[in-house]
Every structure is written in structure tokens, then in C-alpha cells.
Amino acid sequence: MTEEYYYTDNIRIKNGFMEYKSKETFKRIKSHNWHHILSEYGWEKIHLRWIIQLNRLSESKSKNSRYGTLDCDSDGDCFFHCIANALNEKERENDIIYNSDDIRNMISENLTEEQYDMIIGYYRIMKDADDFGEDWDPYQINSLEDFKQKLTTSGHEYWGDYILLQVLMNILKCNIFILNCNNYTNDFSIYNTLNDYNSNYDSIFLIYENNCHFKLVGYFDDKIISYFNDKTIPYELKTLYRIN
């Protein structure tokens, strides 16, 4: 059975390979030109500082980095958009399509009273310390249902943070890794999510840009991959995170 999926009118996956339309025929996208062609879909090469770091960890040096980022949107739902895009790659053959609202609702539906008490308590401590970055007051949230309503509101009301990251990882059975990319503070490091790698889970990698925006990380290997299993995580990322 032929696997065929179109990203755009000019870009498709066929039998595990990404192809682009050149005149009237399709040609395979290669490691030297992937970033030029997939820019039509929104992919671009990962920040130069991360290219340098990952190249240092590579067993085989490549003239063109295979690592890219996808800017999924900047409407306050960027974290949830990134997760949805990665899941859509996983569910492509099942014709299941997620959006940011689905991810918000997924967390809301699985949130327990105990988790709510822990989360809202922590937010109130942050508020007291003038370190709460959201535009709403956690002291105005009086119940789990109040918090769920806030959580499921699209846009800048609730961006998502590392506190809910563990909840989402357990729901999806997926590791979520975050790379800092801050041009202002010159911080290009691993963001510590305080979670250990689970080899039985799949994995998603994100870039956290300038402390305000998430982008999805992908790797080109015959096709762009942004949803990884233990075997498909690139060597450089496994080395960076010390994954055996």
C-alpha cells in the first residue's frame, strides 16, 4: 500500500520520503536542500547557536544541519499548537487532527482535585513573590472548575508552563524536552523540566524562545520528524540529554 500525504500542493510524503514538485514531476527532498523547500510549510533551520552545539556532539559532521524549528503560531497558544502539530504527525495515518483547544481540553479533563490544589497553591506563592507571569489573579480562582475554565480559554489568558507539563506528559505518555534559545541573555541551554526520560514514551522537543514563545523542533531524515520514539531520537539530542 502506497503511503501518500500532502503537506502543501507542492510537498508530499510518499513511501516514507518527502518530495517536492518540480515542474510536473516530484523529486525527493535531500538533506542539503530541505530547509529551502520546507520553508514553504514554515520550517527553518534551528538557531545557529544550537547548530554549533549539536554539531559538536555529532558522530558524522554534516555541511547542512538537519535540525529545524516550526513556528506554529504566536497567539498565546504556541505551546499547545506545538504539541498538537507533533501529535498530528503521529496520527497522520489515522486521520486524527488535533488543535490547541484539544490539548487544553485534554489537560482540563484529566486534572484532579489534588493536582489543582498543588498548582493553585504554587501560583499563589508566585503571586505573593511578584513572580507570577500570567494576566490573571490566582486568588480569584476558587475551585477546580474555575481553574479548568481558565485553562481552556484560548489566547493569552493561560500560556501553559512547566507545572502542567508533567500532567500533559502523563496523559500523552510522551517525554517533552525544552531547549532555551534566548538572544537577550545569551542562554542556549537545556530547560530543566525536572522530569526523567521514559524510554517507553515517545518524545517531543520544543524551543523556548526569549522566554516568551515556543517552537516545535524537527529533524530531517528523508522526511521532517517532530514526533520521536526511542529509536528515532537523533544521536545528538540523545547525547545532549544523556539518554542511553
Residue ranges and their predicted role:
Residues 148-244:
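Deubiquitinase catalytic domains
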